[in-house]
Amino acid sequence: MPTDTVPAGPPDAGGGAGGQLAGVIFDMDGVIVDSEPLSMKTIAEMAAERGIQLEPALLHELTGVSLERVMEVVGARLGDGVDPVALRSDYDARYLPRLRASAAPTPGLERLIAGLASAGVPMALASSSTLAEIGAVTGALGLGGVLRGVASGEEVTRSKPAPDVYLLAVERLGAGPAGVVAIEDSATGVAAAVAAGLVCVAVRTAVTHGHDFGQAALIVSSLEELDVAGLQRLVPGRR
């Protein structure tokens, strides 16, 4: 399958022997599980029941944004009479059971994880999602024993595109940022990973096809296009 290399990526991106692949950090929604359409559908459903139709463009903009920020935006659209705590509780009550019931690995995930594990490359997860949502997905996919660390947006002060959640994931991975590759599917996520000093691969999905991935070292349409050797080549070579 074809891939697009982006000139804005780091030196050696997509070519050469590369340096040492020290770890891989996955985003969750849209990367390891196709949960973003379900999340946006749930939010739109909640707003509609309260008399507000959310535009597709707004839902598109909210992709990859922390749930706290999503609730702020939706709450503002619904008006002053909305209890933000009740809104969040309603979302959790609807979304988490649906997520547990429908979570399935994205194409290529299981093969990529098996290859990384076989090569001894540590893996972690950095997501704007809550710990409850992360637990629902990692439990459904059986990733609990695979990931060395998990970092949630609710554990940091600043959400993506700030680097905080990636810096926390790198810390829990047990490595410095050098040699670590992040896999993202949103412009905010790519910006966060790059700001944390990581090389980033962008997965262009149906939900994020219009996002600006100019900071990514590589753009693919599926995890099926990635393997250990390809990720290794993205790591800048030692000078």
Q: Can you name each region flagged by the protein language model?
A:
Residues P2-H60:
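Active-site neighborhood of HAD-like aspartate-dependent phosphohydrolases
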Residues S39, T63-L67, L87-Y95, T130, ...:
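Hydrophobic/aromatic residues within well-ordered alpha-helical segments
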Residues K41-P84, P107:
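Alpha-helical substrate-recognition element adjacent to the catalytic core
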Residues M1-A22, A114-A117, T130-R239:
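Asp-based, Mg2+/Mn2+-dependent phosphohydrolase catalytic module
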Residues L38, L62-S66, A104-G108, S129, ...:
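Short beta->alpha linker loops
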